């Protein structure tokens, strides 16, 4: 009865929430997306806004990966100086290089160079957009009410300044954790692990030392990645621009966070948490996949996907993986577009695409092998499926650490693991009941919320359009770094203390000299007369 009452209360809250913001329709929204998996969550929000009657324009490079047509929005296409073949080559190179061996010292440099293969292409997209006169003329005449963008690449941030539009940012996290610096959130290194460290929020002293040093590198890394965008901003705006200040122009941050998964940390009032927004209620399986699931018998299935960026795995590693999958009794559905491993077992089926969320929501799914991208991690949490994680790049190592810390999965190094390592990890998360219990607890906590993340995101985009911004802006943005840390106050008080101490010392020294120095001189003079 209590459960039914609780469910009814949540439903009532959701209905009331929707009713309160369901009357304002018909605003114009400009969307500057980032291609690839970043677009998937943004697309859900954009289509929900389009379904509510808003006029939405999405800026799309003529060569793209996932930015397809939709009845819910209009695409404005701008030219880019490369073709589909070059784009495919860049993405393929990006995926393949994550399987090359690297030393501990060369790892960060290799990771940086590999990421730049794709990041340079995104920069070319931005450069082409900001230099395309027809598109800029169209945007100036568009009379948009707000701009919605993914600030991982700051093209939309620059356009918002150029057009004078309030902004909404949909974001997972900069490679340098600077969303909190830009947003004004306290970000202490003592318990908030920095990106790429693979630390938890319970750090040892040596880990805190490393965390502190990594924190010092974040600003240089930001300028290393984004200095070219600052040059673009100067070119477009015809004035000197400090790129970080553009991120601080009163945006609403829609952060794909949920503290069920993330480590707890302070956030600002203009930061809205919508983690798990990509988790939809599972649809009905197609006949093809239903047949796979039904044929699995009592052992069930394992879902395996390394994301859209990995199209092929080196033959030796693919054969090791295939050998491992053949050692478990479950049926394995492996999303893989590369060459078929010669030793592929009878229990393993290769598919070019799979309905990941629907399969994870099936009661016969026993485990999820994932590269630990945030979309896959949240789908695993939503559906309560324990995970074997093979992180490859970016924030995936940190995501895997979070799940492992909560006892809901096992992490393997994809370059170093053996066939037995993978097989044993699968058997562990499937047969050890604690992994299922822990992920089910995370799932229960994650889904127990008064408002769905998609509804919350739509509300805040409409809020910005209605009020032309109005996000709470912390005064921290107006302070210098030494004011923010109260170093001027500390220096002033320290100066007072030192001055008082100095004056006190001088007074004491003077008094000592007057009281005892004179007696000493008199005694010395008396002795000299006697002699």
Swiss-Prot record:
Q: E.C. number, please?
A: 2.4.1.17
- Function in brief: UDP-glucuronosyltransferase (UGT) that catalyzes phase II biotransformation reactions in which lipophilic substrates are conjugated with glucuronic acid to facilitate their inactivation and excretion from the body. Essential for the elimination and detoxification of drugs, xenobiotics and endogenous compounds. Involved in the glucuronidation of arachidonic acid (AA) and AA-derived eicosanoids including 15-HETE and 20-HETE. Conjugates small planar phenolic molecules such as 4-nitrophenol, 1-naphthol, and 4-methylumbelliferone.
Tell me the protein's name.
UDP-glucuronosyltransferase 1A6
PROSITE patterns per the UniProt record, alphabetical = UDPGT
Enzyme class, one word?
transferase
Where in the sequence is the signal peptide annotated? 1-26
- State the organism of origin: Oryctolagus cuniculus (Rabbit)
The protein's annotated catalytic reaction(s) are: glucuronate acceptor + UDP-alpha-D-glucuronate = acceptor beta-D-glucuronoside + UDP + H(+); (5Z,8Z,11Z,14Z)-eicosatetraenoate + UDP-alpha-D-glucuronate = O-[(5Z),(8Z),(11Z),(14Z)-eicosatetraenoyl]-beta-D-glucuronate + UDP; 15-hydroxy-(5Z,8Z,11Z,13E)-eicosatetraenoate + UDP-alpha-D-glucuronate = 15-O-(beta-D-glucuronosyl)-(5Z,8Z,11Z,14Z)-eicosatetraenoate + UDP + H(+); (E)-ferulate + UDP-alpha-D-glucuronate = (E)-4-O-(beta-D-glucuronosyl)-ferulate + UDP + H(+)
> Keyword annotations for this protein?
Endoplasmic reticulum, Glycoprotein, Glycosyltransferase, Membrane, Microsome, Signal, Transferase, Transmembrane, Transmembrane helix
Q: Which residues are glycosylated?
A: 294
Q: Which domain of life is it from?
A: Eukaryota
How does the record classify its membrane topology? Single-pass membrane protein
Q: Which residues are listed as membrane-spanning? A: 489-505
**GO CC annotation, single:** endoplasmic reticulum membrane
- UniProt family annotation: Belongs to the UDP-glycosyltransferase family.
Query: Short name of one Pfam family for this protein?
Result: UDPGT
Give the UniProt subcellular location, in the record's own words. Answer: Microsome; Endoplasmic reticulum membrane
State any single GO MF term. glucuronosyltransferase activity
**Induction remark:** By dioxin.
């Amino acid at each position: 009865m209590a459960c039914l009452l609780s469910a009814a209360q949540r439903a009532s809250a959701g209905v009331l929430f929707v009713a309160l913001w369901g009357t304002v329709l018909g605003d114009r929204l400009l969307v500057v997306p980032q291609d690839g998996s970043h677009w998937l969550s943004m697309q859900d929000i954009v289509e929900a806004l389009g379904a509510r009657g808003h006029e939405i324009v999405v800026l799309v490079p003529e060569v793209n990966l996932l930015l397809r047509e939709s009845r819910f929005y209009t695409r404005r296409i701008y030219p880019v100086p490369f073709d589909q073949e070059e784009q495919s080559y860049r993405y393929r190179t990006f995926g393949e290089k994550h399987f090359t061996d690297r030393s501990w010292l060369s790892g960060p440099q290799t990771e940086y160079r590999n990421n730049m293969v794709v990041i340079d292409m995104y920069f070319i997209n931005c450069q082409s957009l900001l230099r395309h006169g027809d598109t800029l003329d169209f945007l100036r005449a568009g009379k948009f009410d707000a701009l919605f963008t993914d600030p991982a690449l700051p093209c939309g941030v620059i356009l918002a300044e150029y057009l004078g539009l309030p902004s909404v940012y949909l974001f997972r996290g900069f490679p340098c954790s600077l969303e909190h610096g830009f947003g004004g959130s306290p970000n202490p290194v003592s318990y908030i692990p920095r990106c790429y460290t693979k630390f938890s929020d319970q750090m040892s002293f040596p880990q805190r030392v490393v965390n502190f040093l990594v924190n010092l590198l974040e600003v240089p890394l930001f300028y290393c990645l984004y200095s070219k965008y600052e040059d673009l901003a100067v070119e477009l705006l015809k004035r000197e621009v400090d790129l970080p200040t553009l991120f601080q122009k009163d945006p609403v941050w829609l952060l794909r966070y949920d503290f069920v998964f993330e480590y707890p940390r302070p956030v600002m009032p203009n930061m809205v948490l919508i983690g798990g927004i990509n988790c939809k209620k599972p649809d009905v399986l197609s006949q093809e996949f239903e047949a796979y699931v039904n044929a699995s018998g009592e052992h069930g299935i394992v879902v395996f996907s390394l994301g859209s960026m990995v199209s092929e795995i080196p033959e030796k590693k693919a054969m090791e993986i295939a050998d491992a999958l053949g050692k478990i009794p479950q049926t394995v559905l492996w999303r893989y577009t590369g060459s078929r491993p010669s030793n592929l077992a009878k229990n393993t089926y290769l598919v070019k695409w799979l309905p990941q969320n629907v399969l994870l929501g099936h009661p016969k799914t026993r485990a999820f092998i994932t590269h630990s991208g945030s979309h896959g991690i949240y789908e695993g949490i939503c559906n309560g499926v324990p995970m074997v994680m093979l992180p490859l790049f970016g924030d995936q190592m940190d995501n895997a650490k979070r799940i492992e810390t909560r006892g809901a999965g096992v992490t393997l190094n994809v370059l170093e693991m053996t066939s037995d390592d993978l097989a044993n990890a699968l058997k562990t998360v499937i047969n050890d009941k604690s992994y299922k219990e822990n992920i089910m607890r995370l799932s229960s906590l994650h889904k127990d919320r008064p408002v769905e993340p998609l509804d919350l995101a739509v509300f805040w985009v409409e809020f910005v359009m209605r009020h032309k911004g109005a996000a709470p802006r912390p005064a921290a943005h107006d302070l210098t770094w030494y004011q923010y840390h109260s170093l001027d106050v500390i220096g002033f008080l320290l100066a007072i203390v030192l001055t008082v101490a100095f004056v006190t010392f001088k007074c004491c020294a003077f008094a000592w000299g007057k009281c005892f120095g004179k007696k000493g001189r008199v005694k010395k003079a008396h002795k000299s007369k006697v002699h």
